[in-house]
Design a protein with these regions (language model features):
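Oxyanion-binding and handling regions
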Residues: 1-23, 32-34, 91-223
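Residues at secondary-structure transition points
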Residues: 30-38, 69, 73, 77, ...
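Short, well-ordered amphipathic alpha-helical segments that serve as non-catalytic structural scaffolds
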Residues: 35-50, 96
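Short amphipathic alpha-helical face segments that pack within enzyme cores
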Residues: 38-41, 77, 81, 98, ...
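Phosphate/pyrophosphate-binding loops at sites that engage ATP/ADP/AMP, CoA/4′-phosphopantetheine
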Residues: 43-59, 152-159
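DPxDG-like acidic metal-binding loop motif
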Residues: 59-95
Length: 223
């Protein structure tokens, strides 16, 4: 049996989850940009609800980006601090994959094209397919593109288009299969619960960093 703490702060909303064996507990903010205000309180609330001690957490699942710079730094700092203090490892996962996983848990889509606002005229994009256990499997590497390049990525073959924090920009697509959704800890927890089926493995806290993508210089910071 495994106890997993999930920290999802890659969007404007703070979303924290805890899996105690097969029981799932979630704390999700409805206020934007309140990561610093809520993250520790959310974790404490989840530990109380689940009747777990911090020391009983087996590992921490972390959404590492791409996404909100401030949110990613906050989530990563907290995850690293807890992991160091508890001598636990971290499972770093793409925030685009977490978003796709959240959709697969709520909708019957088989294939997704993810679009997420990156600011500075850039968008983050990714493609995912539903596999065994409803897991989101990436079809391409996460990328940052210019908004003007979006038409090169979206085609009539895309079964579903998912957007996060870019609703007004994507409204012009007028696609019947356009869904608007944000990252949620339940998607992160679902992926983490199938750790053995993922291509990403547990890492020591000093090996985990936020992932930033830029369409301007294609810079990616990962270790």
């Amino acid at each position: 049996m495994t106890n997993i703490l999930a920290i999802e702060t890659s969007s404007v909303y703070c979303s924290i989850g805890l899996a105690k064996n097969k029981e799932i507990y979630i704390e999700h903010s409805q206020e934007e940009n309140t990561h610093g205000k809520n993250i520790f309180g959310f974790i404490d609330n989840l530990l109380k609800k689940s009747q777990l001690e911090k020391e009983e957490i087996d590992f921490i699942a972390l959404s590492v980006g791409p996404g909100s710079f401030t949110g990613l730094r906050a989530g990563c700092s907290v995850a690293q601090g807890l992991a160091f203090g508890l001598q636990k490892k971290i499972l770093p996962l793409s925030s685009l994959r977490v978003l796709a996983q959240t959709v697969f848990l709520e909708h019957k889509a088989k294939e997704l094209f993810i679009v997420k606002e990156a600011h500075m005229n850039d968008l983050y994009v990714g493609k995912f397919i539903r596999k065994n256990n409803d897991l989101a499997l990436p079809l391409i590497k996460d990328a940052a593109i210019k908004k003007t390049e979006l038409s090169d990525f979206i085609s009539s073959d895309n079964k579903e288009v998912i957007c996060s924090n870019c609703h007004e920009f994507l409204d012009y697509l007028i696609k019947p299969n356009l869904l608007k959704i944000n990252n949620h800890a339940k998607g992160l927890l679902h992926l983490a619960c199938y750790l053995n089926d993922l291509d990403t493995k547990l890492k020591n806290p000093e090996e985990v960093y936020p992932t930033y993508l830029s369409g301007t210089d294609q810079w990616k910071r990962t270790k």
